Amino acid sequence: MIRFTQVINSEGRDNFTDRENCLIVCLTMDERTKSRLKVCLNNGDEAGLFLPRGTVLKEGDLLQAETGEIALVEAAEEVVSTAFTDDLLLLAKACYHLGNRHVPLQVELGWCRYLHDHVLDDMVKGLGLGVRVERAKYQPEPGAYGGSISGASHGHHHH
C-alpha cells in the first residue's frame, strides 16, 4: 500500500506539471481533516494518509508518498446547503449567525455554503436568504487563528 506522508509545499506545487497523469484522491471535507486515513485512489489502488496531526488538505494540494508517488487532492461533492442573496449585508448577517453556531462555512461573493442541515436552512431562510440543497464541493474557511477547520462536534470554546 502506498503511504502518503507529506504535503508538497507551494513551491513544489508550482513546479509540478504532470497533473493530468498523476494519481488522484477524492476526499470529503471531513476526510481532508484526518491525519490517518485509508483511501482509494483513482486507479483503484488503496493508499494510506500518514500526515502530521492538524493537517487540513485543500483541493489542489499534492501529496507525496515515501516511495515518490504524487497524488492530487480533489474535493468530493457532498450534500450541502448553499445560501444566496444579492444583499451582501444580509449575507454577512447570515454568516454571523452561522458562525455563532460554530458552523464551518465556505464564504463567497453572494453566497455561503455549509454541510446540509434543515434546521440551519430554516434559520437562514428566516433571515431572508434563498437556500439550495445540492451536491457540490465544499471548502470552508480555515480557522481565524491558524487552527484547523472544526465545528463538527458543536462544542463550545472558552478563551
Curated annotation (Swiss-Prot):
GO terms for cellular component: cytoplasm
Gene Ontology MF terms: nickel cation binding; unfolded protein binding
Keywords for this protein: Chaperone, Cytoplasm, Nickel, Nickel insertion
InterPro entries, per the entry: UreE, UreE_C_dom, UreE_N, UreE_N_sf
The keyword Repeat is assigned to this record: no
Pfam families for the chain: UreE_C (PF05194), UreE_N (PF02814)
Localisation per UniProt entry: Cytoplasm
Top-level taxonomic group: Bacteria
One Gene Ontology term from the biological process aspect of the record: protein folding
NCBIfam families, per the entry: PRK13261.1-1
Family designation: Belongs to the UreE family.
Protein role: Involved in urease metallocenter assembly. Binds nickel. Probably functions as a nickel donor during metallocenter assembly.
Protein name as it appears in the record: Urease accessory protein UreE
Organism: Vibrio parahaemolyticus
